[in-house]
Amino acid sequence: MSHAADDLDRWMRTAFVEMNTELEELYFAQEDRANVDGVGDTIKAALVDEGRALIRPLAAEGNTNEGFDHAFDVLGNLGLFLAALRRHELTNPARESQSPFAEASALGLHIGASLGVAPRFATAHLATHNRAVDGVQKSFTALADEFVFIDYNTMGILSYKRAADALMRVPPLGISNRSTLMLLNNARDALNDVAKTNDILFTRLDKDRFFYSVRPYYKPYRVGRQEYRGANAGDFSGINQIDLLLGLCRANDPSYSQLLIDKMLFMIPEDQTSLRACLIHVPLLDQFLDAAPSASGKEWFRLNCRAFLEVCEAHGFAAVQHHDRLFESFIVKMSDALDSKHHAQLTASGPPLPVLAKALERLRDLRAAAKRDDFETAHGKIETLKRAVGWGA
């Protein structure tokens, strides 16, 4: 890492965190906790000045070809800086045609283009690629609730990746292979771990602190002239690999395929490759349905199909859990009490909250194979397999 990159990283882990934390305490002490205007202006000015002074020499260096990890780390630091400026209303895409922070934008665009990723901070920067130093990883603030959010989101993502890795190993083996049973059980166990970490997250995370002091750092902002949506907890390939390999979601569903396209550049290149790779495989649901007429009485089918259904059930449970206990409780219900003047750009993804809520509800019910009359889910096909193996008997 160059001296300039090292200096920025050190600042991001110290003064940057301290200033954001101080601002959050000022905001949170107000009657209107969502207000940031006219609060802590001296701190905000220092945040801008110190950050820009450290970024200028880095921008002069450009992408120094020191490998993916170095470049992605620098991009993350630039992105965290811009996200903090957006949170404190020092930049806002609604009132600008381009970012007022030219140096950070220029370097971010350079690195993003060279790596094939969006030129802003992404979920991976605070999750799977968030290097801890002396036991402390990067964050916006020193608030305990932010670390609860970062830690248990990261654990959930890693468990999803374990499940996806197990399922990706099934197609070369075939659904009747004895080793497939082990892999399906591995995937189920990993998804059960997702539910366990979700439960800890929802129990320990304070709703007010999350809504007012953590969530606002995940808003859209401009890099150069382009506005980029905020980082989303689902910006990794594992959860979609599971959707597609199980057959609960389909790539030929226009709404779902649009989701895949929209998130592609917000994932690391390795994840982009993994997501593309899983698109060539016939979903396991279809394979078990095709085999059922001739194999439902055979031991391999009974064991492997039941294990497959357990994976589907675990995936659906985690999806319902996340939607109902995090999104509904920590965002939708909290926003109901928010002054309407703060509703603009409430969500990380950009669209109004009711639009986002409808899209996420649809995704939840696809993953849960829920019975819906207004769109097709895997409900009927899953019920057919359950009857074939005597599920619940």
Regions found by a protein language model. Give the residues of each.
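Surface-exposed peri-terminal alpha-helical interaction modules
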Residues: 1-393
